[in-house]
Amino acid sequence: RRSSDLPLGTLEWHGPHMPLGADGIQSKELFVRVAEKVGGVVLPMLFMGPDRLFDDRGTVFYGMDINTEGALNTYCAQQMKGSAYWMEKGLFQDLLRSIFAQLSRAGVRIVVGHGHGPSTNAFQEMKEEAEEKYGLCIMTAWTYADDERLKYQNDHAGANETSIVMAVRPELVDFGQVKEDESNLIGIAGRHPVRESSEAFGNEILEYTMKTLIAGIEKEYKTIKER
């Protein structure tokens, strides 16, 4: 089948309990499972991506360096340990254009991209351009997902993402790294990752996403064949 899956990763702080590469790990694990069902090539993950940025007199903060609405705990702006991924959105989309051009040249017709939230949004914004200029149908793991509770990677290191990693790479989740007073549980948006995460919830998210994404890919294949 002429489809490719692009994990939109980052090297980004995901709390003390999760790996820096959590975004790409989650999307890659999803894509490998989907490709086993419907075919396709899982591409190497990206680790750079766009995000909000604030320059405070030469000190640059981006992403979860900055306290945001929905953050689990309020905190002062700080450079989160290990985060090293920021790329200007326009440059990121230029990179995607180059990827689209090469995949189109190779005969790919469908590209699924997912991972880091701002990267996923920037990818999806290019849907019309990808179709008109490169003859590609692009989609994300959210395109055919209607259940907000089960949308894949719909928070930042909260109960959703933590549960997914517990399901796909359980050895990478270590709640023992969270201090007893939870003072290092910052840079997290979503429901409480320690109290509300579970492997069972992660598997529920994974199974729902696989079902909806596979159905979407099959639908697009049918549309392409009928053209």
Question: What are the residue ranges of the model-derived segments?
Answer:
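Extended, histidine- and acidic-residue-enriched regions that form the cofactor-binding/catalytic faces
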Residues: 1-227
